[in-house]
Amino acid sequence: MSAPRDLLPQDILVPISVGELMDKITILEIKSERIKNPSQLKNVVHELEALRAIRLRDIERAMLDKLSAELKRVNAELWDVEDAIRDCEARSDFGEPFIALARTVYRLNDERSRLKKAINLASGSRIVEEKSYRSFST
């Protein structure tokens, strides 16, 4: 990966996995589509452009694009579920719909983790994030 040329002293560069980079980009894409506040949107677009400027070498683009699209779908679904949870919270409604939504969050996060790992393996990322949770039965 190459670094942007216009780095400032306050910019922090840290090594991350390719999956983490793609996750961050997909979340920023969702934010850029959904955030309406102009000053917030400006910050989101700035960060998104900075991350998109990072070039990934020797990666099978078709596979990465497919996995990234799946990751974006999961992140968008997580966004919607989190919004619905906040709506329940605002109404102090902690019944069955709230419980179902809360359970959906960890299932979606498991899928998100699986996709990030698949991106890491497909891209040959030197850093591979690992998650470890107790398994659950459906």
Report residues per predicted region:
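Extended, charge-rich alpha-helical interface modules
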Residues: S2-T138
